[in-house]
A protein has these predicted regions:
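An aromatic- and glycine-enriched ligand-binding surface/loop that stacks and positions planar moieties
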Residues: 22, 30, 48-208
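Aromatic-anchored glycine-rich loop motif in surface-exposed flexible loops
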Residues: 1-49, 65-70, 209
């Protein structure tokens, strides 16, 4: 959709091809990159897209389309030298697990980050109408009825709906990866050790992201 819909045209929109959609995505990002700032004030504009963020998005689009040479060229503008900051000041954090620490919002490794708020006038009664201003994903994938004893060292997690649990195959594929401990949480093991409790949902494995 390139033009606003009206009450008379909204029912006559033709479905276009995926190729046309991706061509438009490429066009939008290519035109936006020169106009975007290299950085934004962290205190007032965190979350706003920057030049590097748009380049990273364009690179991922190229990869999805199989355009490897184009992807390599644009991502080279974002990656920088291994171990050092890129031209926009982004660099990997020393510890992978620090990515998930609440105090590390909008850190140097973050190219694109969505800011959520709990201060909006919204609740679950408005589900699906666009008035939910929090991070619903945490609720969807959180362990159902999660709780832990006061003296437990288990992490503080929101109780959720137990959707999209990590599969056994994913667990097995990642267990030798150095990032494993900060990626998959075995709540089933925590429950067996008396450190936490939850109720398993559909296709429960006990593994949560």
């Amino acid at each position: 959709l390139l033009d606003p819909l009206t009450a008379t045209t909204m029912y006559d929109v033709e479905q276009t091809t995926s190729e046309a959609v991706y061509a438009q995505i490429e066009k939008d990002l290519t035109e936006a990159i020169p106009a975007l700032p290299a950085s934004v004030p962290a205190s007032t504009e965190s979350g706003r897209l920057t030049k590097g963020a748009a380049q990273a998005m364009l690179g991922k689009v190229y990869l999805f389309e199989g355009k490897k040479m184009e992807a390599a060229a644009v991502l080279a503008q974002v990656n920088g030298t291994p171990g050092a900051a890129n031209q926009y000041g982004n660099k990997l954090l020393t510890n992978f697990s620090d990515l998930w620490v609440v105090a590390n919002k909008f850190n140097t490794e973050s190219l694109i980050e969505v800011s959520h708020t709990s201060a909006g006038n919204s609740d679950w009664g408005f589900w699906g109408s666009g008035k939910d201003e929090g991070n619903s994903l945490n609720v969807m994938v959180g362990p159902r009825t999660y709780s832990k004893p006061a003296a437990s060292t288990a992490p503080d997690l929101p109780s959720g709906w137990c959707f999209n649990v990590a599969t056994q195959n994913l667990y097995d594929a990642l267990k030798s990866d150095p990032r494993f401990g900060a990626t998959i949480l075995d709540i089933k093991a925590l429950k067996a050790a008396g450190e936490a409790d939850y109720i398993g949902g559909y296709q429960d494995t006990g593994y949560f992201l």
